[in-house]
Amino acid sequence: MTTDNRKLTRTVAALRGRRIGVAGDFMLDRYIWGTASRLSPEAPVPVVDFMNESQVLGGAGNVAANLAALGATVLPFGVVGEDEPGGAIRECLAAAGMASKGLVADASRITTVKTRIVARQQQIVRVDRERREPLSKNLEESLIRRIKTALGQLDAVVISDYDKGVVTDALAERVLTECHRRGVPVLVKPKTSRLFAYRGSTAIVCNAKEAGFFVTRQLDDDESVGQAGRALLAHFGCSSVVITRGADGLSVFEDTVTDAFHVAATSREVSLDRIGQTRTDHASHGRQVFDVTGAGDTVLSVLALAIAARTPIREAAVLANAAAGVVVGKLGTSTITPVELLAAVRDL
């Protein structure tokens, strides 16, 4: 084991016990598992023979689940409907050791559910059940109060915005302002509909496609990635920007450092964002890729924990990339444990 590996191993141990608040769009990911060996006579689609079904936390809930699996104390903040899926989210939180008192119930809102039908390790179709209108002012105020009340006991806050209406401009701005006042770091997974609400964040974490939307251009070469990273730093006035790039790893841009830092993944079984990068590299051994669902949430979770533990962003990025390499080897929305993360670090 190298000196760097030993250092990362110590960092993994330091992640446990951190207190992280997660605010955003909590969803339920449902899976229908089956087999498919024939086509329907009614339409050119496969017939899936049902085997079983399962459900896990999705969206901001997947961030919370990853944090909890890594040993953090997690305080979730969001809105769910007064319906069966909303109850299922509370049950999933409880099963993972998280309280749901930070969730606000809205009788007029349906809980977001994403149902995936999977056969032979292949997703056949996804059905989304959701509403995207912004929260009412009363609900918004209730959620903000709950977050502000808890800030004194948090080491970091994650805002996970999937553009389902829970994260409003007012909520983002007021939470960021209060976090700044208290010295609590804030990591944000932003949406393009809120270009100004996240100014002053500690770190912005997005994928290459989202970064391209922000700078209104396609990121198709090394130069465009660098320009996007610098533009996002300037626009959001944040300390760092992390752009995830699927099988090509991730890139880190810092407000105090001129050169970008790239953590390269050697796996090429799947590619979300095929963008070349030749900057400072740290390799992550290639792994078999089954499903990229939620890999970005895992990156966000590990970054948040590492920053809460006062880990430098570059070291945090190496850990986050290693974690993503583990979860893409699992089918469905997945989490990572400290044991799995330690094993991945030792393989670097």
Can you say where each PLM-predicted feature lies in the sequence?
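Conserved phosphate/ATP/ADP-binding segment of small-molecule kinases
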Residues: 165-282
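Positively charged, low-complexity intrinsically disordered leader regions
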Residues: 1-37, 345
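Substrate-binding N-lobe of the ribokinase-like
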Residues: 2-12, 41, 45-113, 343-344
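A short, aliphatic-rich alpha-helical micro-motif
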Residues: 15, 151-152, 195-199
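Conserved phosphate-binding/catalytic loop of the ribokinase/pfkB sugar-kinase fold
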Residues: 103-109, 116-151
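Conserved post-catalytic alpha-helical subdomain immediately downstream of the catalytic base
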Residues: 235-239, 269-344
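Short acidic, glycine-rich surface-loop motifs adjacent to enzyme active sites
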Residues: 153-166
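Active-site metal-binding loops of divalent metal-dependent hydrolases
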Residues: 26, 162, 298
